[in-house]
Design a protein with these regions (language model features):
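Substrate-binding cleft and catalytic face of glycoside hydrolase catalytic domains
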Residues: 39, 45-66, 76-199
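Aromatic-lined carbohydrate-recognition surfaces of secreted/lumenal glycan-active proteins
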Residues: 146, 172-209, 253-263, 337-345
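Short, flexible loop/turn segments at beta-strand junctions in immunoglobulin-like
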Residues: 448-452, 522-524
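Hydrophobic beta-strand segments within extracellular beta-sandwich modules
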Residues: 459, 530-532
Length: 550
């Protein structure tokens, strides 16, 4: 019997959650270099998604007299924030999915939306293709969103009613088709979304909204729509989603990569503390922005105010929309929103280093709040007491805590919201139910094996009468190489071992940790050497080995 031996090293991916409907995530907007600085916070928070955007014209296009005249190729290939974005993805691993939005504000760089076929539009596509290839960006994102609030960025006047709707529709259709061609040529698997529309219930005359929706509804290369909700009133999230689903008839996936109630808060940034102030050791005449500056200084000095004090201030005002995060999340659930990314952290410094009477209070929408409430005993950011309880309730109430797909297997870690008397159903692309089993009441996970690589499966948790408790569509990983690869990652307290790229002539394999045989889902995380003995039908054995990295 001959022996084939390979020594392979892979990284341990410490991450938190996977993809299913209503997954929560972290939005970093243009600060795509920030996630790498908050890896431990992202792990601790158990978010499922990380989202950022890139301003294509501002960063990567040459502009002269309101016309796009070229591409800054070197600027794209040496863009350090792009590299850091990808480094964060690799540090977080398979279960945290990344979303990249492409911000293309035509109003600032051209007189109108360029026509399809013009040099200006070709420059946009050229820059995008180079960006997607740089640092393997395209291979590390799950979703690519074409556009970012185009109602404002394409508008030619202040009423937002004349925004080159037809030209923008043509642009998005051509963009989606180009992206699909690149995907096919390069083996990229990200999903294409259009968006991100904002305030749709306030813009009944907008040309841009129906143009974007038309592309979503009619272009088969577009998977769904990104919908932002920056609301003035707490019921606006419901209004926006209802209009998209009912009036415009969008049946494809929805995601929400930005949401806030900052517009309801901004008019009050200079409100006085009043009676609350005198009761808590401040003056009645102190303004909210002055209070925020003061407590930021205290947090920076290591003597932050208490979460109770901070929360009580805002809840003393009748205008503050209590539990707005919970209200929004209920809307996201109702309309089956696939991914939800809100502001994650508020740290010292940044664009709003000092507040004044005109500062917009975006930061009150952050989940973690070290700028105002400092760090806890373990060095982690203290949370925002106005939102954090609702964030935790939403996160921990999910039916699925983690969902990790390999090439031939699917690992599901059940969350607190799962009905353990339920039935797991897995259906293939032909509509054939390939798995139907009751959940194991003794285990908090389910491992589904013997799936086909590169195949989309519909996975659902059902009641006994087949009523759906939770569902998602999951695509197994495609075979990407000729040689077997041993991989592992930590998933909710388990080690999940995956053998990738196994050829058809494999008859069996064994996985061992420090010489002791283990299952591919293993509770022991304390070993040092992980090996897999792969036996082929001709009797040969291939040994794969990797060192566990803590």
């Amino acid at each position: 019997m001959k022996m084939k031996v390979f020594l392979m090293f892979v990284l341990l991916f410490l991450c938190s959650m996977g993809t299913k409907a209503q997954d929560l995530g972290a939005n970093y907007n243009e600060n795509i270099d920030y996630p790498i600085t908050e890896i431990e916070m992202l792990k601790q928070s158990k978010v499922s998604w990380v989202r950022g955007f890139v301003n294509i014209p501002n960063l990567f296009l040459q502009n002269e007299n309101g016309k796009i005249v070229g591409v800054k190729e070197n600027a794209i290939r040496t863009h350090i924030p792009t590299l850091k974005f990808i480094q964060a993805k690799k540090a977080l691993g398979d279960r945290v999915k990344f979303i990249l939005s492409l911000k293309i504000p035509f109003e600032l760089y051209t007189d109108t939306v360029p026509k399809v076929g013009t040099k200006e539009m070709e420059y946009i596509f050229q820059a995008t293709e180079i960006l997607l290839k740089t640092y393997d960006m395209a291979k590390n994102i799950e979703i690519l969103v074409m556009g970012n609030e185009p109602e404002w960025e394409n508008a030619l006047d202040t009423d937002l009613c004349h925004a080159d709707g037809e030209d923008y529709r043509a642009f998005l259709n051509e963009f989606a088709n180009r992206l699909t061609t690149w995907k096919q040529a390069n083996g990229w698997t990200f999903d294409i979304y259009a968006g991100a529309l904002n305030r749709v219930s306030e813009l009944p005359k907008s040309e841009t909204v129906p143009a974007v929706v038309s592309v979503v509804n009619n272009n088969p290369n577009v998977v769904g729509l990104d919908l932002h909700v920056h609301a003035l009133k707490i019921n606006q999230a419901e209004d926006d989603f209802r209009i998209i689903r009912d009036k415009y008839g969008v049946t494809k996936k929805l995601i929400c990569t930005e949401f806030s109630m900052v517009r309801a808060l901004n008019p009050h940034v200079a409100d006085a503390l009043g009676e609350w102030g005198t009761k808590h050791g401040y003056t009645a005449g102190m303004k909210i922005y002055e209070y925020l500056n003061l407590i930021a200084e205290k947090a920076n000095a290591g003597t932050p105010v208490s979460a109770t004090e901070f929360k009580s201030l805002f809840e003393s005002y009748s205008w503050y929309p209590k539990n707005w995060y919970k209200t929004f999340y209920e809307v996201f659930k109702k309309y089956d929103t696939y991914a939800i990314t809100g502001r994650f952290s508020v740290v010292p410094g940044g664009a709003r280093a000092v507040y004044d009477a005109k500062t917009e209070m975006w930061e009150l929408g952050g989940i973690y709040f070290s700028r105002y409430l400092g760090l806890d005993a373990d060095g982690f950011y203290n949370p925002n007491p106005l939102l954090y309880p609702d964030f935790i309730a939403a996160r921990d109430g999910l039916a699925v805590s983690s969902l990790v797909g390999g090439q031939r297997e699917l690992f599901i870690s059940w969350g607190n919201g799962a009905d353990k008397t339920g039935i797991l159903s897995v259906t293939d692309e032909e509509g054939t139910e390939v798995v139907r089993r009751s959940l194991d009441s003794e285990n908090d996970y389910t491992l589904v094996e013997n799936l086909a690589p590169g195949t989309t499966y519909h996975v659902a948790l059902l009641k006994s009468d087949d009523a759906v408790l939770w569902k998602d569509d999951v695509k197994t990983k495609s075979v990407t190489g000729k040689f077997p690869l041993l991989k592992y990652q930590q998933v909710d307290g388990y080690m999940l071992v995956q053998l990738l790229n196994l050829p058809d002539d494999v008859s069996s394999y064994k996985v061992k940790l420090d010489g002791q045989e283990i299952n591919i889902v293993n509770k022991n995380l304390n070993g040092q050497i992980l090996t897999a003995e792969v036996t082929y039908k001709d009797g040969s054995v291939e040994i794969l080995s990797t060192t566990i990295r803590k």
